[in-house]
Design a protein with these regions (language model features):
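Generic marker of "main functional regions" within proteins
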Residues: 60, 79-82, 138, 153, ...
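General "foldedness" signal
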Residues: 83, 88-90, 151, 157, ...
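Beta-strand-rich solenoid/repeat architectures in extracellular/passenger domains
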Residues: 93-124, 134-149, 159-170
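Extracellular zinc-dependent metalloprotease catalytic-domain scaffold
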Residues: 1-94
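Structural detector of coil-to-beta-strand junctions
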Residues: 125-129, 150-154
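Weak global preference for isoleucine
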Residues: 26, 31, 49, 56, ...
Length: 170
């Protein structure tokens, strides 16, 4: 069983190099839904809140999980919680390059844009989240958050290179 929805699909489609998948409206093979022995559903996203992993490495939802909840009808502005999400993996022969030019700051409910003059005050927020392996990420924009337990850059994966230019602040 797989879950797909408009927001979830958008996250995975923008993070694909497959032009055929990028043109699809909605696919239903983005996130696998599994069931434990007691028939409780969980997502096949390692080490996340909505998974059944033995080890949960962060006490809040990932962007993928927030998008699932949004697709199920919850009223969530994901931009409040996560600036940029990368859900993609390269190979050991070829790293996937990502240039992040969108910063993370306080998000305005009225203009629906980030406010570069105000840091985010949302607890447990993440400026940039990399969920995958073999990525090269150039964080070319600032991340400003003063929320309790906020993280500038969260990496769930291996063999990722994160490059932060000297003039970028996190």
């Amino acid at each position: 069983l797989y879950f797909g929805g408009e927001n979830t699909n958008r996250l995975f489609v923008k993070n694909t190099n497959d032009p055929l998948k990028r043109d699809q409206k909605i696919t239903f093979d983005n996130i696998q839904v599994l069931f434990d022995k007691d028939s409780n559903a969980y997502l096949n996203l390692r080490n996340t809140i909505l998974s059944n992993s033995c080890f949960i490495n962060y006490g809040f939802y990932t962007l993928a999980e927030l998008n699932v909840l949004k697709d199920l009808g919850y009223d969530i502005d994901t931009e409040d919680f996560v600036g940029t999400g990368i859900y993609q993996s390269g190979t050991n022969n070829e790293l996937l390059a990502h240039d992040i030019s969108k910063g993370f700051y306080a998000f305005s409910d009225t203009t629906h844009e980030y406010q570069p003059d105000k840091p985010s005050k949302i607890p447990l927020s993440i400026g940039t989240h990399v969920y995958g392996n073999y990525n090269e990420v150039h964080q070319n924009s600032n991340i400003a958050s003063i929320g309790f337990a906020s993280v500038g850059i969260r990496v769930d994966g291996s063999y990722n290179n994160i490059i932060v230019p000297k003039n970028t602040t996190i």
